[in-house]
Amino acid sequence: MGFKPFLEGGIAAIIAGALTHPLDLIKVRMQLQGEHSFSLDQNPNPNLSLDHNLPVKPYRPVFALDSLIGSISLLPLHIHAPSSSTRSVMTPFAVGAHIVKTEGPAALFSGVSATILRQMLYSATRMGIYDFLKRRWTDQLTGNFPLVTKITAGLIAGAVGSVVGNPADVAMVRMQADGSLPLNRRRNYKSVVDAIDRIARQEGVSSLWRGSWLTVNRAMIVTASQLATYDHVKEILVAGGRGTPGGIGTHVAASFAAGIVAAVASNPIDVVKTRMMNADKEIYGGPLDCAVKMVAEEGPMALYKGLVPTATRQGPFTMILFLTLEQVRGLLKDVKF
């Protein structure tokens, strides 16, 4: 197993992650709306002015539907959703504008250091392992790498990468969500290193792998759908004469398709993962308990909260990821290590 695929994947993922970080932050804020600890404070940062003549609406994505169930008394955690009169649609763009207005432009890059560390650990690992398995499992005579085999390689690579990158993932979610919390509950982490250190000391080392079962499953779904779709669509385009292996158009089309497939497939488990990682303590009995409470209190479409920013983030992220990856591969093709 060579080191070069890990380096190539890591470089591409860091660039893609840093450039699309604001979209990921907006996605996290929208996914956390409706959770008991989420703040709709009209001015969470008192040092920044806010025009109180403009109503601030709850962060609900366009696909969210009001729950017809209401509060369930049998659930151990009672979360009372806002009344229908206070619920309204707020687009990802409006959420981003609200963050800039109330927290400042720099808030869109809250947790970017954690994103960079996460990509170094998670994406470099998953892409390196996928490349290794691809080389091992591709038929040497025909060059055939079946779709089912691609998906299997993606599932394995995603699982390993997620375990390695989970501490950075927890830190990233905490740092991205911090601005949405009431002032007295904010963690105010100085950096990803400070976040990981404080989480480990205050909540125990095991808390760095909080939600790891979800992270593993999400990473398996994302990696399998993302990498397998990219390779497969690319092969179809080339075989059909609609593109060349090294063509930019081929890379753009394949990466865009991969981003959309990954976003739709992973959003439900991503929402649950975000809720569990953002919790300061174990308020949920597990992933299933978290999902049940969300659906009961916020409606079934709560599992697709943040789908629009997820898709608008996954699309550009995946396109930048693979376009950069192809260029890095070209630059390092003659380098041996």
Swiss-Prot record:
Gene Ontology CC annotations of this record: mitochondrial inner membrane
One Pfam family this sequence matches: Mito_carr
Solcar repeats: 4-136, 145-236, 246-331
Compartments (UniProt record): Mitochondrion inner membrane
Presence of keyword Cell membrane: no
GO biological process terms, semicolon-separated: mitochondrial transport
TM helices/strands, residue ranges: 6-26, 105-125, 151-171, 210-230, 252-272, 304-324
Database matches in Gene3D superfamilies: Mitochondrial carrier domain
Keywords of the record: Membrane, Mitochondrion, Mitochondrion inner membrane, Repeat, Stress response, Transmembrane, Transmembrane helix, Transport
GO molecular function, one term: dicarboxylic acid transmembrane transporter activity
InterPro entries: Mit_carrier, Mito_Metabolite_Transporter, Mitochondrial_sb/sol_carrier, Mt_carrier_dom_sf
Domain of life of the native organism: Eukaryota
Record's keyword annotation contains Mitochondrion: yes
Topology term for the membrane: Multi-pass membrane protein
Family to which this protein belongs: Belongs to the mitochondrial carrier (TC 2.A.29) family.
Job description of the protein: PUMPS are mitochondrial transporter proteins that create proton leaks across the inner mitochondrial membrane, thus uncoupling oxidative phosphorylation. This leads to a decrease in the efficiency of oxidative phosphorylation and an increase in heat production. May be involved in protecting plant cells against oxidative stress damage. Recombinant PUMP6, reconstituted into liposomes, transports a wide range of dicarboxylic acids including malate, oxaloacetate and succinate as well as phosphate, sulfate and thiosulfate.
Protein name: Mitochondrial uncoupling protein 6
Organism field: Arabidopsis thaliana (Mouse-ear cress)
